[in-house]
Amino acid sequence: MKYTLGKQERLKRRKLIEKLYTEGKSVKNFPLRMMYLQTQHTSDFPCQVGVSVPKRNFKLAVSRNRIKRLLRESYRLQKEIVYNNLEEPYVFMISYIGKEEPVYEEVFLKMQKLLNLFVEKTKEIKNE
């Protein structure tokens, strides 16, 4: 598996993002929240991901961009957790909901836990 986060793996389509926020479900592991939705997207990858940091909590764009870089990097290195356990295509948005700027180690560990929670939820849904 390549540990890259290419253009086709990124969630960019406005309609998909709107549908994700209106119909999607969420999983939380503070300070991260993941909104996810099973869908039929046109990408060759099993999931598309987007990251967001609210302007309300971080006024400076420099801070928001740094946190988004941390989120993308920690997802990129751990995406095999999701790829090895999914059968249907998903789109999801990972949001940082904390109030202070995180350090990378914290984000990495929280992302790992969040991805495992997501996999458990999808397996529960599949078993029902």
Regions found by a protein language model. Give the residues of each.
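Positively charged, solvent-exposed patches that mediate nucleic-acid binding
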Residues: 1-128
